[in-house]
Amino acid sequence: MNIRPLHDRVVVRRVEEKKTTSSGLIIPDSATEKPSEGVVVAVGNGKKNDNGDTIALDVTIGNKVLFAQYAGTEIKVDGKKLLIMKEGDIVAVIK
C-alpha cells in the first residue's frame, strides 16, 4: 500500500458486513448500515505535544478497531475503499 498518514492519523479498511441472514435471506445494500469496525492498515508517526516531542499512537498496523459510524474520510487507494481518520475517532481496539 502506497500511503502514509501524517501525524496522529490512521488508515482503516472496513470489515465486510454479512450480506445474508442466518436463514439465508439476502440483505440489500440499501438496508444495511456501514460497519463501524475495521482493520488498521497504516499509521502516522504520532502527535506532537507542546514541547515538540512526538507521542506515539496506541494503535498499530493489524489492530482490529471500532470507530464512530461517521468517523473519517473515505478515500480510494489502489482501487480499495479505505477510511482515513484521527486516532481519537477510534473508540476501542478489539483483542
Curated annotation (Swiss-Prot):
SUPFAM superfamilies: GroES-like. The keyword Cytoplasm applies. It is found in: Cytoplasm. GO terms for biological process: chaperone cofactor-dependent protein refolding. GO terms for cellular component: cytoplasm. GO terms for molecular function: ATP binding; metal ion binding; protein folding chaperone; protein-folding chaperone binding; unfolded protein binding. SMART domains: Cpn10. It comes from the Bacteria. Pfam families: Cpn10. InterPro entries: Chaperonin_GroES, Chaperonin_GroES_sf, Chaprnonin_Cpn10_CS, GroES-like_sf. Keywords: Chaperone, Cytoplasm. Heptamer of 7 subunits arranged in a ring. Interacts with the chaperonin GroEL. Together with the chaperonin GroEL, plays an essential role in assisting protein folding. The GroEL-GroES system forms a nano-cage that allows encapsulation of the non-native substrate proteins and provides a physical environment optimized to promote and accelerate protein folding. GroES binds to the apical surface of the GroEL ring, thereby capping the opening of the GroEL channel. Belongs to the GroES chaperonin family. This is Co-chaperonin GroES. It comes from Vesicomyosocius okutanii subsp. Calyptogena okutanii (strain HA).
